[in-house]
Amino acid sequence: MSFEVTGPPLVSPWMMLSMSEARNDIDETKIVIPGHSVCDAPQQFMRGHGTYVRDGEIVSSLSGVVQQLNRLLMVKTIKQRYAGEVGDVVVARVVEVQAKRWKCDVASRLHANLPLGSVLLPGGDFRRKDVEDEEKMSEFLKNGELICAEVQQVQHDGTLMLHTRNNKYGKLQQGILIKVPPHLIKKSKKHFHTLPYGMAVIIGCNGSVWVTPSLPETTLEEDGSHVHEFQIVPPDVRVTMVRIAACVRLLRDYSISIYLNSLTTCYEMSQPYEIKELAEQDTSSRLAYLIAARLLQELQQQK
């Protein structure tokens, strides 16, 4: 028995089954499983990564999405470790302080490196780092602290080189971190968002979403949530933070792509429910279906 699940990474495959009848072109978003035929005309294509030839046809060896590059067919796995690219915005956790660099966990195969020379020191200094700065590295960033950084370079072994030489990057405090599969993060030109609810969100390309209050005296674009002194967060702001975090988890649990539009749509449609109800299966499944339907409608209108 063979079956085919269609749908872009925008929503979960099981939702797309009931919505794909009106779609005409579904080849580019076809999801395959091991042993499943990749294409209908194998003689016109060459096999690539994640495929093999069986009885004259190209068959998938992985569970993932079919990708085509000219005449080359490949299968890209849906769930995989984060593989960074230059320019990616990531939310990382410092795991070790070494000589002239910090080791950071970015949910990749290897820990990323943050060199001392690639850090903007407190006060906004762009000066040359000296021995005194190296001795104070553990004061700048400690083990377990969260940072927002940008991928500057990808080395030959896959190690990511980070930098925070910009005011919008740096240490993160007073917020909520939600981990999601990296493939659910939709790439965009902007990953720093100030929401109209008095919140700010950093959607990291590595699958880490940071929710923090947008403080009135500063903006996220100006200081990147550099908080050197803890400030009192009002109860209503905390409730909003928890609701946004619950919305991110709902999108994650139902495999809906996470970006600004999907997050704001989920937040607005969740208003009739209490926050604790968003974790209940009946409420969350019904809400996820409505969110997916609206996002699909908006996508079709854009086309």
UniProtKB/Swiss-Prot annotation:
GO terms for cellular component: cytoplasm; cytoplasmic exosome (RNase complex); nuclear exosome (RNase complex); nucleolus; nucleoplasm; nucleus. Pfam families: ECR1_N, KH_6, RRP4_S1. The keyword Magnesium does not apply. One of its GO terms (biological process) is poly(A)-dependent snoRNA 3'-end processing. It comes from the Eukaryota. Keywords: Exosome, Nucleus, RNA-binding, rRNA processing. It is found in: Nucleus; Nucleus, Nucleolus; Nucleus, Nucleoplasm. InterPro entries: Exosome_cplx_N_dom, Exosome_RNA_bind1/RRP40/RRP4, KH_dom_type_1, KH_dom_type_1_sf, NA-bd_OB-fold, RRP4_S1. Ubiquitously expressed. One of its GO terms (molecular function) is RNA binding. Residues 175-213 form the KH domain. Non-catalytic component of the RNA exosome complex which has 3'->5' exoribonuclease activity and participates in a multitude of cellular RNA processing and degradation events. Involved in regulation of antisense ribosomal siRNA production. Involved in response to cold-warm shock. Belongs to the RRP4 family. PANTHER family: EXOSOME COMPLEX COMPONENT RRP4 (PTHR21321:SF4), PNAS-3 RELATED (PTHR21321). Component of the RNA exosome complex. This is Exosome complex component RRP4 homolog. It comes from Caenorhabditis elegans. The lineage of its organism: Eukaryota, Metazoa, Ecdysozoa, Nematoda, Chromadorea. The gene is exos-2.
